Amino acid sequence: VGSEMCIRDRLVPARNFPVEVLFLRDDDIPESVASGVADVGIVGLNEVMEKRCPVGILKKLGFGKCRLSLAIPQNIDYQDRNWFSGKKIATSYPGILSDYLHKNGIVSDIHVITGSVEIAPGIRLADAIFDIVSSGSTLVSNRLKEVETVVESEAVLIGTDSISSEKRGILD
């Protein structure tokens, strides 16, 4: 069974408010705002950082809080971040991870995975992971432990300088 969602299904006018809401995948939002497809967007700070699009953070929204962290198997004796030198790290956030490793003088092999990153060490695909952590329960259930927090994230409202004053007034 298949279906195709068209733009009509994703673009919804608001009632009693002069806006239309466009539903997109979170990783598409920064580029859609940067390119002018959308005036503003609500997305995780982690996606803004990873996509590196020319957008500004208009407001931190105080929900969707999580962190991007490095995690390793629970049975490993971890001393410091130099443990990651020469290791293979699975992630869906290669840009943020690469910046962190470079800043800390660590050379590692980054393996990009788009989902279920937490299983990578268990199936010997990687030595460690770099992924979103909220409660940490997914890490525990996969016998991993969080050892380095790299980014604290939450939902943010993003936009560009090109938004009109009329539209800025609606945001206020």
What feature does the model see in each segment?
Residues 1-7:
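Short, small-residue-biased leader/transition segments that mark boundaries at the very start
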Residues 45, 54-107, 164:
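A conserved helix-loop-strand patch within extracytoplasmic ligand-binding domains
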Residues 50-60, 137-152:
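Ligand-binding "clamshell"
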